[in-house]
Every structure is written in structure tokens, then in C-alpha cells.
Amino acid sequence: MTTPPANHAALLARRARVLAPTYQLFYEQPLQIVRAEDVWMYDESGRRYLDAYNNVPVVGHCHPQVVEALARQARTVNTHTRYLAEQPLQLAEELLATLPPELGSAIFTCTGSEANDLAVRISKAVTGGSGFIVTEFAYHGATDVIAGMSPEDGNPLGPGVYTVPPPLGAAGDGDFGAQVGACLERMRADGVRLAAMLVDTIFASDGVVPEPRGFLADAVRRVHEAGGLFIADEVQPGFGRLGEAMWGFQRHGVVPDLVTTGKPMGNGHPIAAVAGRAGVFAEFARGRRYFNTYGGNSVSCAAALAVLQVIRAENLLANAQRSGEYLRRGLRELALRHTAIREVRGAGLFIGVELGANSASGLGGAAETRRIVNAMCRRGVLVGSTGRNANVLKIRPPLTLEPQHADLLLDALDQSLQSRV
């Protein structure tokens, strides 16, 4: 293991002194990142790292068009939605143009957590229900209400929150619709009225489950028949990450009642949204209002608008599809040589690599995955981990990733699997 830079001890001491212990750092040897560009992040020594993990900079770190849009608007005016302004209207129009026509309105927030919190509030008001269905290892955000719907973090479930097992994928024998149906029966037996089913459409925290395509449809049908709404959490899979479509729910042939977005929407600038059916919003607005001081502010909207424009202009959905297929093919070739790789799953540039026991390291499951994440970091490639058993490598690079970058990732993973450290 390399020796950490001398200044890290001082930074860690300052951090421990002034930041609450709820904060966590990535990697056994934390990185000090001082600048970034496209798919690269640079530490204080100038060493570069391939960022294959942070799905926030969806069009690449510090994209010049996004930076210029931010700066130009910040030099002009930054205000909120209680004044007439062009920026939130243009952003809403362009965002809604990427969604099914049934989803005709949007509300802006600052984070995906806020967006999910608002979607939950809307669903309660519209349905009169208080029950929610999420998957067993879901993560949907950090507000008090949404933390109670995010069992990944070990949070206790909130009142009226029920869980279902995640879909098992093409290789499994699970029927997600049947699981949701059984959950609805439990809720009825408990006298709980359904408000909504909230799912991340790539099931990222459950281990990345994109297949079989269409498995959500039966579950959504059952939810609607029970009088509930379907909330598609697109904070992680949205904005073209899955390649073939802008949004994860589109791969399943369903139209949500509410769609939430977040992380990549501003390419690092805090902006998020809830899009929904006109009737749902109209019912919510009856006797209620929602205002968020920074949700829909001029500068954030300028950044998000630039992100949408870059995705179109640079044809990033097609690149995510092409580079994602290249990377998954390379990962499956590695699996033929490394028995530690159990399965490669994914769509576009959202990929999960499930790991098991590795004879080279003598480790298995979560311990091996943790070792691989840190070994790849030492080799200049950043990935993360996810899943109920913490044994799935999570790969989410900017949509600008090219095959030559994928080759660097594949080489780092190959070397890490062969090593003992």
C-alpha cells in the first residue's frame, strides 16, 4: 500500500474537528481531488484517475458549455419562481419533451431527496393513502421521510412502508409483479391504504437489475388497480445513462404517475425535479401550494438546460449504448478468466459486476469487493460497490466514456483480480 501524502493527515484532522462524523470518505486511502475534466479527476500531485463512479457529471466533469451557461446566468440575475422568468419555463419545456406526453408538468427542487420527498407528499394527498412499497435494499434519499423508505442505509422503515424483494433478473426465478401483489395483500390485511410504489428503475442499491426488460409492467398494473401511484425514481438511471432511452422506466414500457430526477440534472450543480400527470398535480394543488426558494432558480436552470443540450448535441445516449456494450463485453471476457466474477449486469453505462470468492486473494463477497475497489483506485480507476451483500462493483462513468477509457478500466480490474492486495 502506498504512503498517503503528508498533508492528508492535517486535512483529516481538520475534517474530524469541524465536520460531523456522519460524513464518510471513499477509499482506504482517501483522495484529495483538486480539479477534474471530462472523465478524469486529478489529485493534488497531478495524478489523474479515471472516474467510473460519480454519475453526477453526466456530460463529463466541468463541461465548458455547462460552465459557461452557469457563469453567464450568474453574471446576469439569479432569482426564484415567484417572478416571471424564461429559464425555468424553457427548462421545463425541454425536460418534459423527453418524457411521455402524459407527464405534462414539472416542479423543481434542489436535490433528488427533496424530489422524492415531494413525490411522496403528492401521492399521499392525491390517493388518501399512507402505505408505500419499496424494495428491500432501496436507497431513495436523506430526508426524514425518505430515509424511512431507504433500507440500504440500515434505517428503520417509516410508518406504512412495506418492502418487496428486488427482481432477480433474467437468471433468477422471481416474479416482481407477484411479489408486489403479495405485498398489497399484506397491506390490505393490515388495513393500510396504498399511496404509491417507489422504485429506482435500475434497482441500483439492490445490486443493479436491468433485466428482464418489461418486468415492471405487471407490478405497475397491480399498483394502479389498488388505487396507488407509481413513482419512478430516475435520480440514478435517468438522463440517458441507460443508453437506449432517456429514462429507465421507458425500458419497461410503462408510464409513471410521477418521475423524480436529481444527481446528474445540473452536472454537479444542485437541481432536481418532479414531473407528473396533469391530473395528479391539479389534485395536489387543490388547497395546497409548494414553493422552494432555490428550486428552479435561474442559475440552476441554466446549468440543467445546458446539460440537456449537450446530451443531444453530442449524441450521448448513443455513446452510452455503444461504450456500455463495449465495456460489458470486455467484463464478460474477464469473467471467463476470473471465476471471482459471478455475473455482469447493466444497461448503457450503468453496470454492476457481482463478485464471489477469489482464489488469488483468498477473499470472497463483500471483503473481495472492497479489496477490488481499493486496488483499482491505486491503479488510477475509481469505481464503487453496492448490493445487499456489498459484493457488486458499481460502474457509472460520465456518458462521454470512450472505448479507450473502458480498456483502462478493464486492465485495472484484470490486474486487481490477479493481485493479493
Where are these regions (language model features)?
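Conserved N-terminal phosphate-binding loop of PLP-dependent enzymes in the Aspartate aminotransferase
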Residues: 1-421
